[in-house]
């Protein structure tokens, strides 16, 4: 009987130690937001690496399959249309363009709300041969964690005219 009481007490202690409300502490929540912000920021870094290396596959790795992309008055829907835009139209990906994509870090903006968030950044494309800025693009994205990975679900981009 004494053995049964000791086993019962041990089981109760074990369940108490392992139990809990299932809610994350404030510190754990804050840490999760920081981790998610870091993962969302990786989208910007991947975008610029893809643009600088003309790697359309890498660019597409940050887009959700059913994403939308607004460029001026045009709306692209889904991976196929977005891929075609980068492969055939986007300046940094065009043959003969040797551009490096740079982002002013102080202009990057990230928000996180659970499995959704936003990402804003600017791209300054510099022609390697001349060292001149040839294009500036502002990109505003909605992102979402899908199957554990943060992806762009919608984006809007605009290019202001540069003074000559």
Each PLM stretch: what is its role?
Residues 18-62:
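Short, low-complexity N-terminal intrinsically disordered segments enriched in polar/charged residues
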Residues 1-16:
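Sec-dependent bacterial lipoprotein signal peptides
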Residues 44-47, 51-55, 63-67, 86-94, ...:
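Sec/Tat-exported extracytoplasmic proteins
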């Amino acid at each position: 009987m004494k053995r049964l009481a000791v086993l019962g007490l041990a089981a109760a202690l074990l369940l108490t130690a392992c139990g809990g409300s299932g809610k994350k502490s404030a510190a754990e929540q804050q840490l999760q937001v920081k981790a998610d912000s870091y993962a969302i920021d990786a989208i910007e870094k991947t975008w610029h690496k893809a643009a600088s290396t003309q790697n359309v596959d890498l660019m597409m790795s940050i887009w959700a399959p059913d994403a939308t992309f607004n460029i001026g008055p045009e709306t692209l829907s889904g991976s196929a249309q977005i891929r075609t835009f980068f492969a055939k139209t986007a300046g940094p990906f065009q043959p003969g363009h040797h551009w490096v994509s740079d982002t002013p870090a102080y202009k990057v903006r990230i928000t996180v709300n659970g499995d959704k968030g936003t990402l804003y950044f600017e791209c300054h494309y510099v022609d390697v041969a001349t060292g001149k800025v040839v294009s500036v693009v502002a990109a505003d994205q909605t992102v979402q964690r899908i199957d554990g990975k943060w992806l762009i679900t919608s984006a809007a981009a605009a290019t202001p005219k540069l003074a000559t």
